[in-house]
Amino acid sequence: MKKAEIIIDKYFLTGKVDKRIFGSFIEHLGRAVYEGIYQEGSALSDEQGLRKDTLALVRELQVPIVRYPGGNFVSGYHWEDSVGPKDKRPAKPELAWGVIETNEFGLNEFADWSKKAGSDIMMAVNLGTRGPEDAKNVLEYCNFKEGTYYSDLRKSHGYKEPHNIKLWCLGNEMDGPWQMGHKTASEYGRIAAETSRLMKFMDPTIETVACGSSGLTMPTFGSWEYTILDECYDEVDYLSLHQYYGNAADDTVDFLASSKAVSYTHLTLPTT
């Protein structure tokens, strides 16, 4: 048996780890939202239809932040369809996953869920089929206290206080040909820059996240990041590094070696 020795010195600190790297996300995909975190009428749910068992597990994990509403779903997302009286919300074809979205669970329900879960919100905006103006509007709805059209609309929906969301993701996987509103790196870099700039005019206290390439196997990996940062570096706060690591083959050694891929990503992508 091979042996190794590890020396740990808790006083040797190289930097502070941002707790948000341990965040998660929820998307309108399969049973993730409907039945996963929301199931009205279930014995497992509270008075709002929020699954108590799921909430308990998320609180136990102390998940610091959760991204919503997607994922590929966000590229066709009309946030205004998901707010207001539930019986007035439109059911529409959801083209990312090929289902009908009822909008029974929406933006305000997720804000309530996040409070109960003890998690902050990372809100994603639609840069696939929409753009800067829509991102500005949803920010106004979420973060303005009162006295404007969208802030007063939120108040009319029963939410007097703003949600005060501080972290905003600018689209999702925009280099993927599967994405609604798929863009080239230059196209995405420009719209990300202009969207972030407009949103920060509205609320200078927010932070924004530009989308990196969808994964290591993408032909645009690396060059995508260089190009979009040329366009939006001065306007955004973070770049998301996107890659899924799993162990479907039950090969623990191979799975643990995924850390090498993480290191490769950091070494390959542009750094400052």
Predicted regions and their residues:
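Conserved small/polar residues in nucleotide/adenosyl-binding loops
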Residues: 265-271
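Beta-propeller domains
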Residues: 253-263
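Generic cytosolic/nucleocytoplasmic N-terminal low-complexity/intrinsically disordered segments
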Residues: 1-2, 271
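Active-site clefts of carbohydrate-active enzymes
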Residues: 250-253, 267
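N-terminal catalytic cores of secreted or lumenal carbohydrate-active enzymes
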Residues: 2-246, 250
